[in-house]
């Protein structure tokens, strides 16, 4: 590593705890298969004074999705073999069911099951396990759009895949991850941590701010193939090094995961096999983030540079922004986040519907405005 690269990375990494304050965090940079940065700080559990270390287990949340697709591709050369299984799991659907690849590419047309449960009145902090998930999925009658024609981020696409893989193989998903991913990659501490209330080593996710203080986040969701991965920084480093080591193998797992994906009309899709496909600083990037109350993570890979970045926060700071800053430092380019230039508008703000308890937030965007719909928790006196 050159002196200039070392200095840029050291400055960017040392700034993370200041720019993104919270109980703890971790960051790694892998270049040409070599680990340039492996750094942790703060506490994995502030109450017990457990330090955040490279071996601390972390709730990776939706980064799980690429690993679920990795198991899928490892076990089935043609995932379309599972199309009938998808249909069987949507017994009340009144139209043709999506196929397995539609699930893997977030092109299924399904509506997110946890969001649907909240809209039906389920409490945000209530228990949402296997029974609750199956009830929502089994009740699906219609789709948002015809499969393969559009994109919508839906967690149960990957829950369905992991459930189907379990049924097809007769093995639980934790075992499938172990044999298809963790063992070959060398992810020695990685586990399926489906129950989100606690991590087995005591690592805690926090919500709050420096001004208000941080408190342990409350989660009662049961994630599997959609967001159940528990992994350490060292486990994620092993994944990035595996990606680099297999880069020249056309049948290598990550090469298969990052093969170009299109919609039905042939237009390139921005998401496939549990990975976002985008461009940062003029380079093609595959990446994904993870988020749950108290947890934020982000990993990205720039194949043309043989470069990977991993960021993990056990608090709710934007890990994707931190990863972008580290990537910019590694590439030696300025980090210039987009700042909307539209003039103030009366429509910008948050609006509440009293009848439904839903809120809509409008804010500036590069070509106009974005609309975000959020569920507002009930307030008690």
Where are these predicted regions, by residue range?
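Catalytic loop of the DD-peptidase/beta-lactamase superfamily, centered on the K-T-G motif
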Residues: 1-40, 166-167, 171, 175-179, ...
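Short, conserved clusters of charged catalytic residues that mark active-site
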Residues: 8-12, 85, 160
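Secretory-pathway/luminal and periplasmic proteins that interact with or process carbohydrate-rich
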Residues: 36-37, 93-100, 108-116, 184-194, ...
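Non-cleavable N-terminal signal-anchor transmembrane helices
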Residues: 178, 190, 196-198
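Solvent-exposed loop/turn segments at secondary-structure junctions
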Residues: 110, 158, 315-317
């Amino acid at each position: 590593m050159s002196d200039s690269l070392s200095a840029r990375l050291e400055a960017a990494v040392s700034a993370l705890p200041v720019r993104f304050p919270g109980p703890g965090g971790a960051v790694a940079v892998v270049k040409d298969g070599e680990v340039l940065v492996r750094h942790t700080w703060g506490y994995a559990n502030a109450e017990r004074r457990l330090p955040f270390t490279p071996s601390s287990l972390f709730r990776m949340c939706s980064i799980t999705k690429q690993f679920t697709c990795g198991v899928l591709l490892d076990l089935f050369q043609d995932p379309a073999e599972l199309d009938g299984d998808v249909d069987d799991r949507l017994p009340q659907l009144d139209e043709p069911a999506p196929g397995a690849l539609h699930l893997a590419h977030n092109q299924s047309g399904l509506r997110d099951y946890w969001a649907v449960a909240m809209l039906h009145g389920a409490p945000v902090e209530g228990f949402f396990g296997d029974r609750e998930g199956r009830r929502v999925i089994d009740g699906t009658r219609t789709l948002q759009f015809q499969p393969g024609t559009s994109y919508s981020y839906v967690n149960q696409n990957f829950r369905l895949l992991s459930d189907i893989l379990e049924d097809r193989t007769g093995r639980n998903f934790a075992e499938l991850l172990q044999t298809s991913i963790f063992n070959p990659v060398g992810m020695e501490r990685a586990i399926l941590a489906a129950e989100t209330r606690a991590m087995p080593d005591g690592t805690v996710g926090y919500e709050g701010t420096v001004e208000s203080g941080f408190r342990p986040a409350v989660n009662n969701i049961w994630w599997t193939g959609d967001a159940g991965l528990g992994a350490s920084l060292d486990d994620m480093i092993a994944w990035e090094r595996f990606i680099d080591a297999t880069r020249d193998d056309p049948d290598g797992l990550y090469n298969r995961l990052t093969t170009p994906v299109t919609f039905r009309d042939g237009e390139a899709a921005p998401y496939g096999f549990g990975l976002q496909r985008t461009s940062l600083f003029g380079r093609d990037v595959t990446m994904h983030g993870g988020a749950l109350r108290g947890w934020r993570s982000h990993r990205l890979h720039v194949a043309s540079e043989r470069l990977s970045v991993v960021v993990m926060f056990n608090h709710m700071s934007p890990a994707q922004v931190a990863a972008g800053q580290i990537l910019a430092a590694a590439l030696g380019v300025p980090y210039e986040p987009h700042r909307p230039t539209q003039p103030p508008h009366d429509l910008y703000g948050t609006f509440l519907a009293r009848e439904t308890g839903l809120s809509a937030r409008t804010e500036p965007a590069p070509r106009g405005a974005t609309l975000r719909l959020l569920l507002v928790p009930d307030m008690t006196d």
